[in-house]
Amino acid sequence: MPRSLKKGPFVDGHLMKKVDTAVANSDRRVLKTWSRRSTILPEMVGLTFAVHNGKKFVPVFVTENMVGHKLGEFSPTRTYHGHAADKKAKAGRK
């Protein structure tokens, strides 16, 4: 269920301060954040965020297509190593 329109999008205050200073100074440095829950706003387009995935910071360059999504959507937290091979099937092929 989406967030109510009268409430508006959620962005952490500390992250918005970083974005405002970066835009005002036209600073293109990577902005490090743990705020995966923050919504991407149009002011953030063109900035690069280092979003924490629980282990490390994943660089995310914000484009126009990402507006309205959450920062955490672009920093996966789980790694997929594939399913284990079936040992019985391998033994039968010999």
Curated annotation (Swiss-Prot):
Listed Basic and acidic residues bias regions: 83-94
Keyword Electron transport part of the UniProt annotation: no
Annotated GO biological process: ribosomal small subunit assembly; translation
Keywords of this entry: Ribonucleoprotein, Ribosomal protein, RNA-binding, rRNA-binding
InterPro entries: Ribosomal_uS19, Ribosomal_uS19_bac-type, Ribosomal_uS19_CS, Ribosomal_uS19_SF
Cellular component GO terms, alphabetical: cytoplasm; small ribosomal subunit
First and last residue of the signal peptide: none
Region Disordered, residue ranges: 72-94
A molecular function GO annotation: rRNA binding
Family assignment from sequence similarity: Belongs to the universal ribosomal protein uS19 family.
Function: Protein S19 forms a complex with S13 that binds strongly to the 16S ribosomal RNA.
Name the record gives this protein: Small ribosomal subunit protein uS19
Taxonomic source organism: Desulfovibrio desulfuricans (strain ATCC 27774 / DSM 6949 / MB)
